[in-house]
Amino acid sequence: MREHPSTRVDFRSDTVTQPTAAMRKTMAVAPVGDDVLGDDATVIALQERVATMFGKEAGLFVASGTMANAIALRTHTVPGDEIVCDKTAHIYRYEGGGYAALCGASVALVDGEKGLMTAEQVRNAVRKAEGSGSHYPNGSLVCVENTSNLGGGTCYDLNTLDDISSAAREMGCATHLDGARIFNAAAATGVDVARMCAGYDSVSICFSKGLGAPVGSVLVGSRNFVQNAHRWRKMFGGGWRQAGLLAAACAHALDHHVERLADDHARARTIAEGLNRLPEFTVDMATVQTNMVYVDCRSPAKDIVANLAAHGIDVLDTGAHRVRFVVHLHITDEDVTKLLSVCASQWPVESS
């Protein structure tokens, strides 16, 4: 699948995806209402569908994954609480400090392996105000990110997910799963999303990354949780009117763009294996589990980015000597071949 207006090959992120022609047609004819008044049938249908799919009672359609996470954190916590997450977690690194500004919460960071925590690390990280002489914040929420972006697109195994949620409950903590790319995790592990999230009180699911919708995330949880989350969505300015146009795109993505994620994963692995053959690049193959490839470079990353850009290929530098490639529905086998060909010509194997 290509269906992208640009001739450039864009590996910067799976957020660069644009609606396909079929998705646009679905959006154009979607019945809409006023979601603030609760009568947008397409939004209602999406919320119910996603909640059922994830084994939860209710869902809330919001504008972005960051908004879904912010609402979840605020619903689960009160000011002065502490949130446990991995040191690479998106809620800590890339959401503008919302946990502090919007929730009044602090974070306890876990030094996970490739972005993945263990239950024992979670137990050791949770602090409770009670019994501390009021010295500690109150650890009340454990957040897991699956897949882990900065981990390289890595996935939790089911036993670890279950162990973490059990440990959190033992410590008196709620649990939230940041599932921005949870369908990638499901495709890679073969675990159904409802089973994967069974131990988690809330889950955020993004539709504007690998699934290719233009906008939208759904936050799922218990009916009471979603009722409370609805209030925070309003307070955060997230109420919207004829949102069914966007909900229709998300529903189309569920129908047509989930099974194909395995193709993205296969292409990512081809890229990783090809780059590893070149002395310029090093890829930790243990991290290449889904649609991301983080690459360490001998040369400055900004030079790699500029060189590839001159050949019509866009990538992101994520460190002084690190670049990232993300595969999505607009990337074809031909694009992968072009990338590897350009890299082989620009940074060839040194002759002996």
Specify the residue positions occupied by each region the protein language model found.
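Conserved PLP-enzyme active-site core in the AAT-like
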Residues: 2-30, 34-298, 302-311, 315-331, ...
